[in-house]
Amino acid sequence: MDAKKPSWLRVNVPGGERYQKVRETLKGLQLHTVCAEAHCPNVAECWGGGTATVMLMGDVCTRGCRFCNVKTAAHPPALDPDEPRHLAAAIAELGLDYIVVTSVDRDDLPDGGAAHFADAIRRLKEIPGLLVEVLTPDFRGDPAAVRTVGRAAPDVFANNLETVRRLTPAVRDAKATYDQTLGVLAQMKREFPQVVTKSSIMVGLGEQEAEVVEAMRDLRANGVEILTLGQYLRPSAWHLPVVEYVSPERFAAYRDQGLALGFRYVASGPLVRSSYRAAELFLRGEIESRTKPR
């Protein structure tokens, strides 16, 4: 398909004082962001609001998912042991109260980078008042790696299902499977019940509505509490084409179906991404309510 984008996919041009401050601070501290690396359409809204999704473990991924614009290689550069410290310094300088930390996949590392991720979480948690959401790799489903991240006590743990079961082999790298993602999410909720669990689905890749609802049910059955759904947008001619531009009305219907299935919050819209600011605002209130003394 990939015809002309509909009007509801127009985005704001990045700008503003807060946007520039976030951009320059992250650039100065040599931190990679999904906002820039993946050409996120919400960069103006998020950076302008003083938040960002920061990417750990470099900007080269060991997987080649057919929807993703991040660079790939079998053997990326070695990890920078100072990266967690640099990250905490950047967030402290920006004065944020909520940060989303994600990463590339690092299948070349024995633990998939779990210890590096956990180090970053612990350093960030030392910043007073900061809530930490992590969007991690699946660590090839390794329970020990998932446990390492859980023990670092993130406030929110996300791992993205990305698409429906039928399309997973065509959309995601062969190392990533539908059930592996569900297993990682289930383990986190089972072993660390205080951590809010979250996942995301892209639509417009040729899925059927019933398949999206089935994926929602699978996520709920594995303890996922927060769901985001957004339109797949093709990053380049080398990536999967858009099969359909899903209407705002259908996104609204997906939201209603998700809430009926028991998700505590569903962000569903054409420009929604997994690290979506509206979901962040809900999560902040949710976490604070869980931690208040009763």
Swiss-Prot record:
It is an enzyme of class 2 (transferase). Residues 46-264 form the Radical SAM core domain. [4Fe-4S] cluster 1 binds at residues 35, 40, 46, 275. Binds 2 [4Fe-4S] clusters per subunit. One cluster is coordinated with 3 cysteines and an exchangeable S-adenosyl-L-methionine. PROSITE patterns: RADICAL_SAM (PS51918). Its EC number is 2.8.1.8. The keyword Iron-sulfur applies. Its cofactor is [4Fe-4S] cluster. InterPro entries: Aldolase_TIM, Elp3/MiaA/NifB-like_rSAM, LIAS_N, Lipoyl_synth, rSAM. One of its GO terms (molecular function) is 4 iron, 4 sulfur cluster binding. Pathway: Protein modification; protein lipoylation via endogenous pathway; protein N(6)-(lipoyl)lysine from octanoyl-[acyl-carrier-protein]: step 2/2. The keyword Zinc does not apply. Belongs to the radical SAM superfamily. Lipoyl synthase family. This is Lipoyl synthase.
